[in-house]
UniProtKB/Swiss-Prot annotation:
This is Envelope protein US9 homolog. The modification Phosphoserine is found at S163, S165. Its main location: virion. A motif (Di-leucine internalization motif) lies at residues 145-146. Residues 1-193 are intravirion. Phosphorylated on serines within the acidic cluster. Phosphorylation determines whether endocytosed viral US9 traffics to the trans-Golgi network or recycles to the cell membrane. It is found in: Virion membrane; Host Golgi apparatus membrane; Host smooth endoplasmic reticulum membrane; Host cell membrane. Disulfide bonds: none annotated. Pfam families: Herpes_US9 (PF06072).
Amino acid sequence: MEKAEAAAVVIPLSVSNPSYRGSGMSDQEVSEEQSAGDAWVSAAMAAAEAVAAAATSTGIDNTNDYTYTAASENGDPGFTLGDNTYGPNGAASGCPSPPSPEVVGLEMVVVSSLAPEIAAAVPADTISASAAAPATRVDDGNAPLLGPGQAQDYDSESGCYYSESDNETASMFIRRVGRRQARRHRRRRVALTVAGVILVVVLCAISGIVGAFLARVFP
């Protein structure tokens, strides 16, 4: 059985968009190009109708072969696909209907009934071992996730902070980091204050000793 096919033709931009105007084109050239485009569209429509007539006469019944028609049965442009016409407001008679709620519910019941068999197929020790295994991260240059007991031993001076819980939100994380930095700055200020006081005391002691020595040497 012969198959009627229409040759693919590239539509010029001026035809697909009548308001398009090339650079340096006059009004007369634009009108001439639009007239040529209208003639091209008419010729294309005539060729499409001829192909559709040829396909009907040869008895093509393949629903995958479609030809463009000017208007569907309801007056809107669409595609003729076999004996079914698809338009913006039309529906094909051969389209399958959506599944009914009863069928969807039956599928859910079937899936739920397989749950015990799936649980029985997986050994219980495997499930318990996977649940008890600590969370680790592949060593790709990033620090591993630390547990609650290991977080205290982590070097906080490195400036890296990790969430200690999967349930920690961003605001909680920011507040925790802020409190940690505030404690660090407070300890630093206290250490600097103590060091300054000690330095002053040492300088006073040295100056007193030097003064006593000079008073004894030069009475």
